[in-house]
């Protein structure tokens, strides 16, 4: 029977220089999850270079995905208990062995017309895409800040907490999307078991405001 993957967890690049980053990594290594790295300061460098030289969005997109891979390498270097893999099969095998796995994305392996070569598609959307490829039950976004009030997906876009294509890549999916924020690394393991007690549920596009 194929392995059921309960969680894909996107670790925000904004945490790259946080003193809490090692604590998050140790917490992630405690439960078998797939970790999607943000672009972090590596993607910021791509933005700066594109603004200076004006090269095409297609190149910037591929470089930003490489930036995610670089951040993933850094995460594994900081926490050797985490493994690294680049394709769904290898990620699944690692989880079958009880390990947490950091995804190292490859732009050439993501030939999907929904993944636009644009800054409107960031690691949030790619985490949603990977969760779909893996058939994961839930997606958790770890952010350095959380919005006040209701977490409707469109409000997250407007506040800049997720990218503009995230609503489309998650539209119509039955997959649950959750948020957690600063200082919650201590609650991560319990939250993965009981997300409604520790995390904040994201209301998808198909749902109405309440």
Summary of predicted features, one role per range:
Residues 1-196, 206-209:
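Nucleotide/pyrophosphate-binding catalytic subdomain
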